[in-house]
Amino acid sequence: MKLLIMIEKIAALDIETENTGADVRNDNKRIISIQIYNKDISEIYYHDSKEKGLKLGKERVKSLLSSGYSFVGYNVLNFDIPLLKEFLDLEIPLSNVIDISQMNKVVELKQNFKMYKLEAICAEIGVRCDHKKLLVPMIEKLKQDPKIVERAKIEGSKIASLKSWSLQFSQDRALDLICGGSAILQAYNEFVESNGNTNSIFHQYAMGDVISEYELYNKLKRNN
């Protein structure tokens, strides 16, 4: 009697966007890259590439779906999946999506310890997420730009009135988001100018996200 062993087909999926505003969801202007990763796949497709553009990335995702793959990601149901549909008309069935942020241990960490960011969850679970530090020098420099500081104050004031948050908290959050998004875009432009150099900050940052997500999913799954 032969035993059939079902091999789980899983890959982590992540996108980077152009968003230099203070609204994580509604200020996105375009998708700039798609990253896919598992132990056999390590791929990045980006907007300004002639060889590995987003159209090819879209077809790659569809091909993996047709071969039975499911995709994992952090907060993927609220961010990556809807934005892929909005900007690339790429619809990924929810039955083929696993959102790490909704796994039991992560929900517990969010509720009990107020941990929300990928890097905080990774640190708690024991998964490397060092790539997040790559953008820190860029972000800190941008925070010294008077024009950005003034814009953050204006955007923060709007957020405070809408969310009933304190003015200082809202302005600090707006500054973090504006500078974080601007740093990603700056790193991306340098990546494009380098013809997709794998040693560039953007490549390390973007692939770092998807690798951390894949490793986090597998560790959480083993410990469930």
Task: Kindly label every feature range from the protein language model.
Residues 1-35:
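Entry/capping segment at the start of metal-dependent catalytic domains
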Residues 26, 46-49, 205:
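Pocket-edge positions in alpha/beta enzyme catalytic cores
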Residues 38-165:
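Conserved DEDDh/DEDDy metal-dependent 3′-5′ exonuclease domain
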